UniProtKB/Swiss-Prot annotation:
The lineage of its organism: Bacteria, Pseudomonadati, Thermodesulfobacteriota, Desulfovibrionia, Desulfovibrionales. Belongs to the HisA/HisF family. Its EC number is 4.3.2.10. Coiled coil: none annotated. It catalyses: 5-[(5-phospho-1-deoxy-D-ribulos-1-ylimino)methylamino]-1-(5-phospho-beta-D-ribosyl)imidazole-4-carboxamide + L-glutamine = D-erythro-1-(imidazol-4-yl)glycerol 3-phosphate + 5-amino-1-(5-phospho-beta-D-ribosyl)imidazole-4-carboxamide + L-glutamate + H(+). The keyword Amino-acid biosynthesis applies. InterPro entries: Aldolase_TIM (IPR013785), His_biosynth (IPR006062), HisF (IPR004651), IGPS_HisA/HisF (IPR050064), RibuloseP-bd_barrel (IPR011060). This is Imidazole glycerol phosphate synthase subunit HisF.
Length: 259
């Protein structure tokens, strides 16, 4: 059985670490470079960096911050935000990331997934999915709709079907973020996570809502996720990563205790 992963997420705006609830009310909470280094030293399995306004502002990612983070950590590092072309992917990988996370850019131009996989390998391509629960319809039979531009634009695309498409185009991993749960610390959207993990064969990262080790354990077991993305739960000092790993391991999930 493969070890489950704990992945701290750094949402970055204007070069600073920030956090909101349901993509709103973001507040400055520190330096992303120092925070990434701390999580690496605590034993995080991976770090995810999102430039959360790059797509909405139609600009490139903050490569200088990516380079600074990459120079401080020695674990897998995934970067997303404003990635719309293979050249954007290359720039992020050259700045020190092991993986690129495409979200809005992939929805608008799905071929970027296959182009990126051909150029850099599927293992380097993560598709981020921002999802809202809506009324079920012929267009959205699952009741989960894809949204882009930081939750600002509904796309009329069913999340489960989009997940299958991403896998068929060559994505190596999916990061599934429930906007309804994001930042609430009330638990992951387990129905959504399970539906997607059952629909694809590639790893699924659960994102949005972690407030306790029990929430994370549920996502990694009942939700079928291979990894749990976390933010508020560690950013605000509620738990350390070693605390979380010990607690989740004690519940029966296989964790990598030391990197």
């Amino acid at each position: 059985m493969l070890s489950k992963r704990i992945i701290p997420c750094l949402d970055v705006r204007a070069g600073r670490l920030t956090k909101g609830v349901k993509f709103e009310g973001n507040v400055d909470i520190g330096d992303p470079v120092a925070t990434a280094r701390r999580y690496y030293e605590e034993g995080a399995d991976e770090i995810v960096f999102y430039d959360i306004t790059a797509s909405h502002e139609d600009r490139g990612i903050f490569l200088d911050v990516v380079e600074r983070v990459a120079s401080e950590i020695f674990i897998p590092f995934s970067v997303g935000g404003g990635i719309n072309t293979v050249d954007d992917m290359r720039a992020v990988l050259m700045a020190g990331a092991e993986k690129v996370s495409v979200n809005s850019g992939a929805v608008k131009t799905p071929d970027i997934i296959s182009q990126g996989a051909a150029a850099f390998g599927s293992q380097a391509i993560v598709v981020g999915m921002d999802v809202k629960q809506v009324e079920k319809s012929a267009t959205i039979p699952s009741g989960y709709e894809i949204v882009i531009h930081g939750g600002r634009k509904y796309m009329g695309m069913d999340a489960i079907e989009w997940a299958k498409t991403c896998e068929s185009l060559g994505a190596g991993e999916l990061c599934v973020n429930s906007i309804d749960a994001d930042g609430t610390k009330d638990g992951y959207e387990l129905t959504l996570t399970r539906m997607i993990s059952d629909a694809v064969t590639i790893p699924v990262i659960a994102s949005g809502g972690a407030g306790s080790p029990e929430h994370m354990y549920d996502a990694l077991t009942r939700g079928g996720a291979s990894a749990a993305l976390i933010a508020s739960i560690v950013h605000y000092g509620t738990y350390t990563i070693p605390d979380l790993k010990r607690r989740i391991s004690g519940m029966g999930a296989k964790m990598r205790m030391v990197w």
